[in-house]
């Protein structure tokens, strides 16, 4: 029996919405697990990404963006999920954006100050900062806010300095047995990943027109006799007008969403996928905590 040491621990990725947390997670894992889109609040579940390299296993908790407005039930639940995932981790990666600093960033920072885990500050999108002269004073300002373990300017999009963060993560993993087999990338079910892929395509192809009042339920996920999967996805929106928007002119929009989602699913599941999508109006779901629970939004709070 091997007596080699192994290291394993949990790392939370936190930050306000839209700073690049999911893109960073995907880069750290080397593949697409967390949904990335230009819209704030696209990550709604604490997706766990697992990266195993030799004796090291890093388990990433990708939090929903912590944000100040807690009006709707879905936002309250998302903030609760984000706060609870900061609790029991070895290390926190706090992602901020370039030279921007907002009250939401301040709120996340205040939550981190109360925590016990060391915090790496990842200053993302530094390649997009127009005024490079502003960067150094801003980094000095950030350094004065809290005793960070390290401050790393990164570009999650291009991968710049992401390996630096991965190296710091490895150093902070405690000696422990691995929680997951080495080929695991996420502990979420394929059914969950299928719904995330569809939701990402909705965000991508409907852009700013589509509010957050859209969710996806996988009604059927079965293996077929061809060794692939038959998947039926139900897209829930709040109003009839949104339903028309999702379907598009003569069904063109939903067809594109279906084709693109199927491609990603086939790549992720490494098997042929037959995907069918429907759109249904379910008004007010974002304000109904019971409905959110039935859609799996509260399974990990």
From Swiss-Prot:
Pfam families registered for this protein in UniProt: KH_2, MMR_HSR1
Region G4, annotated ranges: 124-127
Region feature (G5): 154-156
Region (G3): 62-65
Residue stretches in coiled coil: none
GO cellular component, one term: plasma membrane
Region entry G2, spans: 41-45
Gene Ontology molecular functions: GTP binding; GTPase activity; ribosomal small subunit binding; small ribosomal subunit rRNA binding
Binding-site positions, GTP: 15-22, 62-66, 124-127
Entry annotated with the keyword Transmembrane: no
Localization: Cytoplasm; Cell inner membrane
Location of the KH type-2 domain: 206-283
One BP annotation, GO: ribosomal small subunit assembly
Keywords from the UniProt entry: Cell inner membrane, Cell membrane, Cytoplasm, GTP-binding, Membrane, Nucleotide-binding, Ribosome biogenesis, RNA-binding, rRNA-binding
Xref: SUPFAM superfamilies: P-loop containing nucleoside triphosphate hydrolases, Prokaryotic type KH domain (KH-domain type II)
Membrane topology designation: Peripheral membrane protein
Residue ranges, annotated region (G1): 15-22
HAMAP family in the cross-refs: GTPase_Era
Quaternary structure and interacting proteins, as annotated: Monomer.
Role, per record: An essential GTPase that binds both GDP and GTP, with rapid nucleotide exchange. Plays a role in 16S rRNA processing and 30S ribosomal subunit biogenesis and possibly also in cell cycle regulation and energy metabolism.
Family membership: Belongs to the TRAFAC class TrmE-Era-EngA-EngB-Septin-like GTPase superfamily. Era GTPase family.
NCBIfam families xref list: era, PRK00089.1, small_GTP
Name of the protein: GTPase Era
Organism from which the protein derives: Salmonella schwarzengrund (strain CVM19633)
Gene giving rise to this polypeptide: era
């Amino acid at each position: 029996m091997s007596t080699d040491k192994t290291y394993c621990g949990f790392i939370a990725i936190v930050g306000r919405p839209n700073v690049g947390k999911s893109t960073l997670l995907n880069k750290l894992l080397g593949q697409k697990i967390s949904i990335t889109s230009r819209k704030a609040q696209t990550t709604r579940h604490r997706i766990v990404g697992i990266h195993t390299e030799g004796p090291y296993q890093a388990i990433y908790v990708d939090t929903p963006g912590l944000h100040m407005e807690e009006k709707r039930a879905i936002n309250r639940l998302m903030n609760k999920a984000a706060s609870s995932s900061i609790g029991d981790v070895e290390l926190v990666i706090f992602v901020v954006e370039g030279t921007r600093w907002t009250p939401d960033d301040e709120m996340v920072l205040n939550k981190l100050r109360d925590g016990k885990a060391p915090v790496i500050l990842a200053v993302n999108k530094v390649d997009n900062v127009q005024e490079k002269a502003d960067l150094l004073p801003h980094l000095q300002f950030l350094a004065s806010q809290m005793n960070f373990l390290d401050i790393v300017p990164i570009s999650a999009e291009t991968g710049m300095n992401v390996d630096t963060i991965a190296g710091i993560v490895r150093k902070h993993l405690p000696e422990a047995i691995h929680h997951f087999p080495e080929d695991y990338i996420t502990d979420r079910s394929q059914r969950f990943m299928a719904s995330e892929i569809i939701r990402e395509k909705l965000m991508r192809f409907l852009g700013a027109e589509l509010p957050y009042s859209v969710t996806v339920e996988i009604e059927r996920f079965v293996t077929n006799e061809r060794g692939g999967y038959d998947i039926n996805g139900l897209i829930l929106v709040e109003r009839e007008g949104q339903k028309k928007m999702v379907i598009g002119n003569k069904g063109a929009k939903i067809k594109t969403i279906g084709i693109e989602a199927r491609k990603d699913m086939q790549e992720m599941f490494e098997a042929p996928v037959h995907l069918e999508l429907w759109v249904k109006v379910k008004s007010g779901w974002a304000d109904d905590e019971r409905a959110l629970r039935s859609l799996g939004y509260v399974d990990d709070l």
